[in-house]
Swiss-Prot record:
Substrate binds at D21, L22, N23, R36, H59, L60, G61, R62, R113, R146. This is Phosphoglycerate kinase. It catalyses: (2R)-3-phosphoglycerate + ATP = (2R)-3-phospho-glyceroyl phosphate + ADP. Pathway: Carbohydrate degradation; glycolysis; pyruvate from D-glyceraldehyde 3-phosphate: step 2/5. Monomer. Keywords: ATP-binding, Cytoplasm, Glycolysis, Kinase, Nucleotide-binding, Transferase. Its EC number is 2.7.2.3. Belongs to the phosphoglycerate kinase family. It is an enzyme of class 2 (transferase).
Length: 387
């Protein structure tokens, strides 16, 4: 993937417009989770230290487009940056007709979704953003799958459009896992339904040497292998699709499972061979033998792509499968990439953050990349790099 990288540019004295992902949770005017801001700080600091005139913006929440609403203001982010950078950071509300700032100064441009035409990627708004800067930096991978004025349109008209460090790292890591993976390559896809991950499964079945399925998705494959899944969540209409995928790719099906009679946090886990599941059973996790078999596969993998837990890991009695998978990934010497909200929650719960090679910051964008779709913001950066 050929894009211009921000770190390769001379930014001294340049007006730099950074589209970051600062869409953080806010309560009572305070940022309650700063992970996304922390991820963006190195990009901002690099520009400031280079002597650039720095403008950073983002969306926050889902305001009615074109209307200001205080609850969706970036002011809490500005207050956070003031403390984190120990310098004065201004919030600029009206900026479409120009922004005055000095070299080495940082301003935050108010929520892009307050601007009419943002979501529809309107050309007039895109050109106004572009007129603010000498260099446009796209650094929000989480919104790279959306063609909007601040993620795509602005880059078409800015003098220079480049990838920020976060976006560049993300593309490099995902490219390493997907385009030319070291083998064997193992992909793990968990989640409740095959239907929501079908394109992901089809895409990965063509790349992976082994495709591990978990959660409700695994139940459909267990049914496809001819076993009873009782009252478990599964999709009968996709059993034939699962069979077809099993013919195309090595998909290990669980040999034992953890069941209960009801979806209850306190339900006791009953370990059963997959052939012994009763009509009133519900499968909530992999059994110990299946977990051990998959752990062995993962330990020998050279590339691992992980999206989704393999069981109801939020319940203590049904966390063992996901824990076993997480620990095997942590122990693997292969290159590992993980992404998706539930996956990140599992990584946090089992304390393996430092042992995963790369953790993706994008939910929808991560999935679309894995599906093999072109991300509009990335396509734009590639086109500008060629121009």
């Amino acid at each position: 993937m050929s894009v211009i990288k921000m770190i390769d540019l001379d930014l001294a004295g340049k007006r730099v417009f950074i589209r970051a992902d600062l869409n953080v949770p806010v309560k009572d005017g305070k940022v309650t989770s700063d992970a996304r801001i922390l991820a963006s700080l190195p990009t901002i600091k690099h520009c400031l230290e280079a002597g650039a005139k720095v403008m950073v913006t983002s969306h926050l929440g889902r305001p009615t487009e074109g209307e200001y609403a205080e609850e969706f203001s970036l002011l809490p982010v500005v207050n956070y940056l003031n403390d984190a950078l120990d310098c004065e950071v201004r919030l600029v509300k009206d900026y479409l007709d120009g922004v005055e700032l000095n070299a080495g100064e940082l301003v935050v441009l108010e929520n892009v979704r307050f601007n009419k035409g943002e979501k529809k990627n309107e050309e007039a708004l895109s050109k106004k953003y572009a007129a603010l800067c000498d260099v446009f930096v796209m650094d929000a991978f989480g919104t790279a799958h959306r063609a909007q004025a601040s993620t795509h349109g602005v880059g078409m008209f800015a003098p220079i459009a480049c990838a920020g460090p976060l976006l560049a790292d993300e593309l490099e890591a995902l490219g390493k896992a997907m385009d030319k993976p070291a083998r064997p390559m193992v992909a793990i896809v968990g989640g409740s339904k095959v239907s929501t991950k079908l394109t992901v499964l089809e895409s990965l079945s063509k790349i992976a040497d082994q495709l591990v399925v978990g959660g409700g998705i695994a139940n459909t494959f267990i049914a496809a292998a001819g076993h009873n899944v009782g009252k478990s969540l599964y999709e009968a209409d996709l059993v034939e699709t699962a069979k077809k995928l099993m013919e195309e790719c090595a998909i290990p099906v669980a040999t034992d499972v953890a069941c209960a009679k009801a979806f209850d946090e306190n339900a006791e886990a009953e370990i059963k061979h997959v052939s012994e599941v009763q009509d009133d059973d519900m499968i909530f996790d992999l059994g110990p033998n299946s977990t051990a078999e998959l752990a062995e596969i993962l330990k020998n993998a050279k590339t691992i792509l992980w999206n989704g837990p393999v069981g109801v890991f939020e319940f203590k009695n049904f966390e063992a499968g996901t824990r076993g998978i997480a620990e095997a990934i942590a122990q693997s010497e292969g290159f590992s990439v993980a992404g998706g909200g539930d996956t990140l929650a599992a990584i946090d719960k089992f304390g393996i953050k430092a042992d995963v090679s790369y953790i993706s910051t994008g939910g929808g964008a991560f999935l679309e990349f894995v599906e093999g779709k072109k991300l509009p913001a990335v396509e734009m950066l590639e086109a500008r790099a060629k121009a």
